[in-house]
C-alpha cells in the first residue's frame, strides 16, 4: 500500500485529489495539509511514502517546502501546478530541485477538467511509491560503466565521404528536467551537430524548461518552432502537445512539428523523433534515452539501428529517477553504452567530434 499525504491550500483540491487517489486499491491517503508548515509536521507524524504538493501556497510555498522535504525526509514529491506563467516557472524550478514529477491543475471547467488528470495523477503517485525513497547522488568514483552490445549491429562511424554530418536526439520523461540540467549545460557551444530533445511535458511548460536550460548553458537552447532550420550548436526542445521530427531539405536539416498521434500516446514522442532521424541516411546519429516511465524511444531506436550509422546511449539505473525508458531499450539489446547521467554529455561530445577526417 502506498501511503500519500495531500498538501494544498484549496479545500476543493484536497478533496478531489484525495478522492481520486482513494479509488486506487494500492493507494491510501493518510492525511492532508493546507500549507508547507502543516505538511512538515504531518510528515513527521504520519510517515507517508509519497506527497502531492501544491506549488503556490501561503505560509510556506511549495518550493521551500519541497527543499525541506528532500533535505530532511528524502521522499518522492508530485508537484501540483497551476498553468500561470509563475506556476510554470516554479514547477520547472521544483523539478530541478528534485521533485519526482508534476501534474497541472485544471484550466477550464474545474470539476470536468480535473477528471482528465486523474489517470496522470494515479500513474505518477504509483510510480513514485514504487520507486521508494529518492536516490542520493552516487559518488563518481564508484560508478560502473557497463556496455551492452546491440542485437542489430549498426555502422557507428561511416558517414558518406566528405559529409561529416551529425545529429543528436534525446528522449526522456519523469526526472528528465533535472537530468537534462546535468547534460545540456556540459555540451560545448560549438558542438558540430544539432541536438533535438523530447521531454514528456504538457503544453506551455517546455518553453520555461528551454529558457531555464538556455540560462544555464553555453550552447544555445530554445523551444523548437515548426519549419526552422536545425543548426549545429543549438538544442531544440520539442514543445509540449506537439510531435517533433527532423527532415532533410536542400539547405540542411529542418524541424517539423505536427499533431500526429502515436501508439505511446505521448506528445511529444521519442519514438516519433527517433524514427524521423533514422531516415537521415547520410548523417551520423547519436541517440540518448534517459530517465522516464514506460518504453517510449525503444521502438524508434530499433528502427534507427536497422537504418544504421547510430550510437545508442542509455542512462544508468543508478542515476535514473525512474528506470523505465532506458531499461526497455537495454532489455531489447539496442544500447551500446550505459552511462551515469553525469557522464552522458562527455559521451555525446566524444561521439560528435569537432572535426571529421
From Swiss-Prot:
Highest rank taxon of the organism: Bacteria
Keyword presence, Iron: no
Principal place of residence: cytoplasm
Matching entries from CDD domains are given as: CheB_Rec, REC_CheB-like
Q: Where in the cell is it found?
A: Cytoplasm
Q: Which Gene3D superfamilies match?
A: 3.40.50.2300, Methylesterase CheB, C-terminal domain
Q: Which reaction does it catalyse?
A: [protein]-L-glutamate 5-O-methyl ester + H2O = L-glutamyl-[protein] + methanol + H(+); L-glutaminyl-[protein] + H2O = L-glutamyl-[protein] + NH4(+)
List GO molecular-function terms, semicolon-separated: phosphorelay response regulator activity; protein-glutamate methylesterase activity; protein-glutamine glutaminase activity
- What EC class is this? hydrolase
Please name the PROSITE patterns in this protein's record: CHEB, RESPONSE_REGULATORY
The alphabetized list of GO BP terms reads: chemotaxis
Q: Which InterPro entries match?
A: CheB-like, CheB_C, CheY-like_superfamily, Sig_transdc_resp-reg_Me-estase, Sig_transdc_resp-reg_receiver
| This protein's UniProt keywords | Chemotaxis, Cytoplasm, Hydrolase, Phosphoprotein
PTM comment, free text = Phosphorylated by CheA. Phosphorylation of the N-terminal regulatory domain activates the methylesterase activity.
**Catalytic residues, chain numbering:** 173, 200, 296
* Residue ranges constituting the Response regulatory domain according to the UniProt record: 3-120
As stated in the Swiss-Prot or TrEMBL entry, residues carrying the post-translational modification 4-aspartylphosphate are: 54
* Entry keyword annotation includes Hydrolase: yes
* Residue ranges annotated for the CheB-type methylesterase domain, each copy included: 161-355
- Please give an example of a GO cellular component term from this record: cytoplasm
Q: According to the UniProt record, which cysteines are disulfide-bonded?
A: none
Question: Which family does the record claim for this protein?
Answer: Belongs to the CheB family.
Role summary: Involved in the modulation of the chemotaxis system; catalyzes the demethylation of specific methylglutamate residues introduced into the chemoreceptors (methyl-accepting chemotaxis proteins) by CheR. B.subtilis has an effective methylation-independent adaptation system but must utilize the methylation system for adaptation to high concentrations of attractant.
Question: What does the entry's domain section say?
Answer: Contains a C-terminal catalytic domain, and an N-terminal region which modulates catalytic activity.
This protein is called what?
A: Protein-glutamate methylesterase/protein-glutamine glutaminase
Protein's organism: Bacillus subtilis (strain 168)
Amino acid at each position: 500500500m502506498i501511503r500519500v499525504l495531500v498538501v494544498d491550500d484549496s479545500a476543493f483540491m484536497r478533496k478531489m485529489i484525495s478522492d481520486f487517489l482513494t479509488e486506487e486499491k494500492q493507494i491510501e491517503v493518510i492525511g492532508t495539509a493546507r500549507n508547507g508548515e502543516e505538511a512538515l509536521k504531518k510528515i513527521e507524524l504520519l510517515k507517508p511514502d509519497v506527497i502531492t504538493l501544491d506549488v503556490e501556497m501561503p505560509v510556506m510555498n511549495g518550493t521551500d517546502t519541497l527543499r525541506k522535504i528532500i533535505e530532511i525526509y528524502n521522499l518522492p514529491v508530485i508537484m501540483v501546478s497551476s498553468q500561470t506563467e509563475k506556476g510554470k516557472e516554479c514547477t520547472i524550478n521544483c523539478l530541478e530541485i528534485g521533485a519526482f514529477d508534476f501534474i497541472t491543475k485544471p484550466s477550464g471547467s474545474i470539476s470536468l477538467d480535473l477528471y482528465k488528470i486523474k489517470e496522470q495523477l494515479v500513474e505518477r503517485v504509483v510510480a513514485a511509491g514504487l520507486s521508494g525513497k529518492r536516490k542520493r547522488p552516487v559518488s563518481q568514483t564508484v560508478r560502473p560503466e557497463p556496455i551492452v552490445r546491440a542485437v542489430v549491429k549498426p555502422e557507428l562511424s561511416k558517414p558518406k565521404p566528405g559529409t561529416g554530418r551529425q545529429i543528436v536526439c534525446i528522449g526522456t520523461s519523469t526526472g528528465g528536467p533535472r537530468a537534462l540540467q546535468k547534460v545540456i549545460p556540459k555540451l560545448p557551444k560549438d558542438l558540430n551537430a544539432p541536438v533535438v530533445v523530447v521531454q514528456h511535458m504538457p503544453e506551455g511548460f517546455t518553453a520555461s524548461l528551454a529558457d531555464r536550460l538556455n540560462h544555464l548553458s553555453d550552447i544555445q537552447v530554445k523551444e523548437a518552432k515548426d519549419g526552422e532550420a536545425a543548426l549545429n550548436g543549438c538544442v531544440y526542445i520539442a514543445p509540449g502537445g506537439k510531435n517533433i521530427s527532423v527532415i532533410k531539405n536542400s539547405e540542411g536539416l529542418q524541424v517539423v512539428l505536427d499533431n500526429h498521434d502515436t501508439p505511446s500516446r505521448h506528445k511529444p514522442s521519442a519514438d516519433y523523433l527517433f524514427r524521423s532521424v533514422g531516415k537521415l541516411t547520410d548523417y551520423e546519429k547519436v541517440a540518448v534515452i534517459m530517465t522516464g516511465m514506460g518504453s517510449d524511444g525503444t521502438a524508434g531506436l530499433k528502427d534507427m539501428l536497422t537504418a544504421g550509422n547510430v550510437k545508442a546511449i542509455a542512462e544508468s539505473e543508478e542515476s535514473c529517477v525512474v528506470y523505465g525508458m532506458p531499461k526497455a531499450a537495454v532489455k531489447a539489446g539496442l544500447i551500446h553504452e550505459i552511462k551515469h547521467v553525469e557522464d552522458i554529455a562527455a559521451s555525446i561530445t566524444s561521439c560528435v567530434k569537432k572535426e571529421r577526417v
